[in-house]
Regions:
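Short, well-formed alpha-helical segments that are part of the catalytic scaffolds
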Residues: 12-26
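A conserved acidic beta->alpha catalytic loop
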Residues: 23, 37-47, 65, 92
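Glycine-rich, basic loop-to-helix element that forms the pyrophosphate-binding segment
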Residues: 63-80
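Short aromatic/hydrophobic "clamp" motif used to bind/position activated sugar donors
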Residues: 85
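Conserved donor NDP-sugar-binding/catalytic core segment of glycosyltransferases
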Residues: 97-135
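Short, flexible, basic/aromatic active-site loop/helix in glycosyltransferases
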Residues: 135-160
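A short, conserved alpha-helix in the catalytic core of glycosyltransferases
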Residues: 162-170, 174-178, 185-212
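Non-catalytic, C-terminal membrane-associated alpha-helical segments of glycosyltransferases
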Residues: 231-241, 247, 251-299
């Protein structure tokens, strides 16, 4: 079937899913939504059942238990009936004419897999303010030494690169051939990077298109989806999955990137994550408490 199947895994994020579903359906190129209910404990399943009964373009499957993002994406892709799949998210917002723009630029660039600019927008910002802020970003889109990239950078023109923002558009058969690796557990860190790098290594052309924009709202105290675990456990999964990713793809990384010794890279990555996401925030809280105690005793 011509058109686009949008695959959306979701877990306990019903307020955001309610906004996302009609937004995707408003895009002319979208023929169906495939929602994968991944062990939700809220009223997501009931909402999706009712929405599907009202609109035949909405299809769903219930994992019953939480199987994780990669497994859920693969399951949704297998159920997709359109020629193209877009890997959606339950809190994603897309710009006007998003899919028309991506399809047009996919044709002109010869891209096999294409992603738009993905901006992480603060809750207090408007879309325009978030775009203006990220327009100031400089430097390369992909940093081959740190194995990272800026998903919201304004590159001005389309460009081929080995890493892309997570929301991707490609032919359904490509997603089914490459597949997400569902051995990435926990918060599934690196699942998209792993998929993209393997696709790149297989000869597929990956293109970043700044002319189509998606927005992820940075939600304070988000406890749904991959954010449902505690901070220490979340960082632990990031480190484990990064180790798995680097070890698994070490030959391709050595050929296409500049990370140096994989063991040293993995160690540096782990130290930086633990310090910036666990130790430093704890120090800030500790410092504030000391100042508060000092002010209280001085009053």
């Amino acid at each position: 079937m011509m058109g686009i199947s949008v695959v959306i895994p979701t877990k306990d994020r019903l307020p955001y899913l309610r906004k996302t579903v009609p937004m995707f359906l408003a895009q002319e190129e979208v023929e169906e939504l495939v929602i994968v209910v991944d062990g939700c404990r809220d009223a997501t399943l009931e909402y999706v059942e009712a929405a599907s009964a009202r609109d035949g373009r909405i299809r769903y499957v219930d994992n019953v238990t939480n199987r994780g993002l990669p497994w859920s994406r693969n399951r949704g892709i297998e159920l997709a009936e359109c020629d193209y799949v877009f890997t959606g998210e339950d809190d994603l917002e897309v710009s006007e004419n998003f899919f028309a723009t991506l399809l047009a630029h996919m044709e002109t660039t010869g891209a096999d897999i294409i992603s738009g600019r993905n901006i992480f927008q603060h809750e207090s910002e408007s879309h325009a303010e978030a775009i203006a802020r990220t327009n100031k970003a400089t430097g390369p889109s992909v940093n081959r030494r740190t194995l990272s990239f800026d998903p919201g950078i304004n590159t001005k023109t389309d460009q081929e690169q080995p890493l892309l923002p997570a929301p991707m558009l490609a032919r359904t058969d490509i997603f089914r051939k490459v597949k997400y690796d569902d051995s990435f557990r926990g918060n599934a860190w690196r699942e998209e990077t792993d998929f993209q790098l393997r696709a790149y290594g297989a000869g597929y052309k990956l293109v970043y298109c700044p002319h189509a924009i998606t927005f992820n709202i940075v939600i304070v105290n988000d406890r749904g989806g991959v954010h449902s675990t505690g901070q220490v456990k979340r960082v632990s999964w990031i480190i484990k999955n990064n180790w798995q990713f680097v070890t698994k793809n070490r030959e391709l990384l050595a050929r296409e990137f500049e990370i140096g010794s994989p063991r040293i890279y993995i160690a540096k990555f782990a130290v930086k994550r633990v310090f910036t996401e666990i130790i430093l925030p704890a120090m800030v809280i500790w410092k504030r408490r000391i100042f508060a105690t000092f002010r209280g005793s001085s009053a």
